[in-house]
C-alpha cells in the first residue's frame, strides 16, 4: 500500500509542477486585467468607523458617513414609484418567469412511499409591460369587489410570479399587505388573519384545500378568498359566508373599462406597505409593520452592496416571499431590470426531490447569475459535494484536494485560480447553472467552512448579510472584495449600528481587543413596531432625541478594527448551567453542524442541570453505511433508536467539538437521534431553517426527561 501511494505521489508531481508554471505565467496578465491590486486595497481598507471617539458610538459605512441613505432612485420614495420606474425603463424586457409543467408521475420509493415527480419545460416569461397590465387589472378588480385603500389584504401562498404581482398591486393601490409563511400551521395562520383583520385573502388551491378549509370557521374577518391557480374548485365544499374567486376572474373583472378607468389611490412614504408576520421561531408569530419609507431605505442599502446589478442579471426566486430577505431581493431585482425565474427547494437542482431522474432542475435551465440562500441550503450543497469527493478514487481525490487547497490559498491572498475553475470546479459550479456571479446568504450565520467551500467551488463571492424582519432585512452585508469568513460585513449605507453592554453574558463595549455587546440598529429602515403589540414594541424599539428609530436585536456582536461586524452570540441562546458556566447553544450547534454524520442539530441545556444534551437529525446515507459496518440491522427508525449508533454520533460530536475548541462543559454528552428530518412543514424549524427551540423542546420532552434522568 505504501509503495502504491509513493507511485501515485510521483505521478501527481507533474500536476504540482503544472500549477506552479501556470501560476507564474498567468499571474502578471491576470493581475492587471482583473484590477487585483485595487480589489485587494478595497478588501483591506476601513469599511466603517464610529461616529465619535466615545465608547458605544454607532458605526457607519465610510462611503456614506455624513448622513444615512434613505432613497436610491430620485423621486421613487414609495414602492409603487419603484415599480412604475422599472416598467417605464424596461418595458418589453423579460421580467417574471415560470416553468411549464409538462407532466406529473408517481414514483414508488424503496420504503413504499409514493413521491410525485415533475417533468418541466422551459421558462415562460412575462415582460414588464405584461406584469404592469396584470397589476392594473388585479387592482381594479379588487377595488370593484369592494376593497378600500388602507384596508388590509393577506397573502398566504407559495413563492411564485402571482405572489409578486399581488404584492405590486397592493403597493400601487395602497392596500397594506399582510404576509404569512406558507408553512405556518393552522393556529398561526388563524392568529395572523384574525389579528390583522384582513377581509381579503390570496392563496393557492393546494393551501386552500390542505390548510385553510378546516380553519375557515375560526377566521372572523375574511370574506373574500382569491386563489392564484388556473384551476377549478368545488365551492360547495366550503362554508357559507365566503366568496371564492380565481385570480384570473378578478383580473377579468378589473379589465372592464368602467373599472379600469378608476385611478388607484396612491400611497405616501408614511403609509403602511406590509404587515409581515414572523416565522415564530421564539413563539407566536408577530406582525412587523413596515412603511413604504422603511422598505425603500432598506433596499437602498442592500442594492449598494451588489455591484453591477442590472438587466444582464437573472435571479432565481425560491425562498419564501413572506421572508424579508427574499421579498426585498426580488423587488430590488425587478427595479433594476433583472429577470426573476421562479423555483422551489423541491425543483431547484437536477437532484431535487420533485425532479424526475434524467430531467433538468430549475438552476440548470435558468442559469441564474444571482441567488439568495439560507445557510442550511449551502450546508447541504457542501455535504453532498464532499460526499461525492470521498467516493472518488485516490488520484481523483488527490487532484481535487490539490486544486482546492491551491485556490483556497489564492483566495486568501485576494487572487483567483482560473485553471482550477476551468478544470476542477466547472462541474460543481454547474450544479447551480454555471453562471452564478454572486450569492447572498442570510437568515442565520454561515459557517466559515461552508463559506470557503462556496467561494472555491462555485467561483463567486458570498455576500453574507445580517438583518432582521424588524430592520426590513437591512443591517450589514459583506463587500464582494472581502473574502474573510465568520463576519457579516460593515453597516449598510442606510443604517448605523451600535453595541450596548450585556453584563449578564459578559460582553461590554470596553472589551479588548474589540468592543462587544448587544447589536442595536438605527435608521429609516427600522420598521414601525409590532402590530397591535405596544408592550413588545416599547421593549424592543426606541426613538432617540433626533427622531431616529432604533431596534435592539438580542444578538451579540463584535466590531473588528476595519468596521466589520461579527455575530458571536444570542441572548436567548445563553443558558447558565448548575455550576455557573454559561453555554451558548447557537455556538455549540454552529461548531458541530458540519459533522459528516449530522444533517441538523439542536443543543439543549437546563439551568438546574450540569451538562448539555442534543437532538440530532443524522445523515441517513452515512449513518446507514456505518450501521452496516458495525453489524447493526433494521429499519431507519431502528438504526436511529440503537444505542450503538447514538454512541457513534457522540464520538463524532466529541471529535468535532475538540477540533473547534469547545469547552468541556459545552460538549453534549447525550443525544437523541431523529429519523425524521426537521423541515418547515414539521413546525420544528422556520422557513429560513432556524430552529424553533420551544417546539423542539415540546417535541422531545420525554427524551429530555430521559436524558436528564427523569422517570
UniProtKB/Swiss-Prot annotation:
The protein's required cofactors: Mg(2+)
Topology within the bilayer: Single-pass type III membrane protein
Domain of life, per lineage: Eukaryota
EC number: 6.2.1.3, 6.2.1.15
GO biological process, one term: positive regulation of cell growth
Membrane-crossing segments per the record: 8-28
Cellular component per GO, a single term: plasma membrane
CDD domains cross-referenced by the UniProt entry: LC_FACS_euk1
Catalytic activity: a long-chain fatty acid + ATP + CoA = a long-chain fatty acyl-CoA + AMP + diphosphate; (5Z,8Z,11Z,14Z)-eicosatetraenoate + ATP + CoA = (5Z,8Z,11Z,14Z)-eicosatetraenoyl-CoA + AMP + diphosphate; hexadecanoate + ATP + CoA = hexadecanoyl-CoA + AMP + diphosphate; (E)-hexadec-2-enoate + ATP + CoA = (2E)-hexadecenoyl-CoA + AMP + diphosphate
Coiled-coil region: none
UniProt function note: Catalyzes the conversion of long-chain fatty acids to their active form acyl-CoA for both synthesis of cellular lipids, and degradation via beta-oxidation. Preferentially activates arachidonate and eicosapentaenoate as substrates. Preferentially activates 8,9-EET > 14,15-EET > 5,6-EET > 11,12-EET. Modulates glucose-stimulated insulin secretion by regulating the levels of unesterified EETs. Modulates prostaglandin E2 secretion.
Annotated family: Belongs to the ATP-dependent AMP-binding enzyme family.
Protein's UniProt name: Long-chain-fatty-acid--CoA ligase 4
